[in-house]
Amino acid sequence: MLCIAVFAIIPQKECTPERMEADFRANHQKIEMLIRITRSWLPDSTGFSVEYSKHGKLTDWGVSSKQEVNFQGVEIGSQKEQEKELRKIGLSLERLDSVRLALQKMDYRGLSINKGGAISDYTEIVYGKTGNKEFNYRIYDKPLADSLVYKLNRCYNLIVYNRYVVFSCVEDFDYDSLFPGKYAYLQKHTLSK
């Protein structure tokens, strides 16, 4: 008996500041539309996050709301129960699926709408993961002040792209890990201005 095994290696998305900038420029209108539509579904004081695997399987979701929503991790029971809980915050399985499809078309993994942040409300888009690092776009509702831009750029894991968008790199066990390629990227952009 002959047994042949074939292994396919799926390349990881390149998570460099230059690649993130290029992807953001290519998708910024789609990102803004996704954020605007998703926020229109949610009550004012409700934050929401959802994350999918590379293959589109729901891996995590969460809600911060005054409304009590019963969810236990990814699985919250039957489809009827899921629909009932999601409707409490203006969502449905169909709406979650449309978020998944929009993220998948842009090759992104997740969305997190944060309300009542220390700086301002913002939305995070999970750009990609490499090893134990997660790379995100943080898109603020209000422009960042000069002093805040300076402070954020001094953080090892953040790069201020513009007054509304910050690139972040979060490592599972070390929140102060260096964003790979950060200083070369900032130096290049400082010289080009």
Name every feature range the model reports, one short phrase each:
Residues 1-3:
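N-terminal Sec-pathway targeting helices
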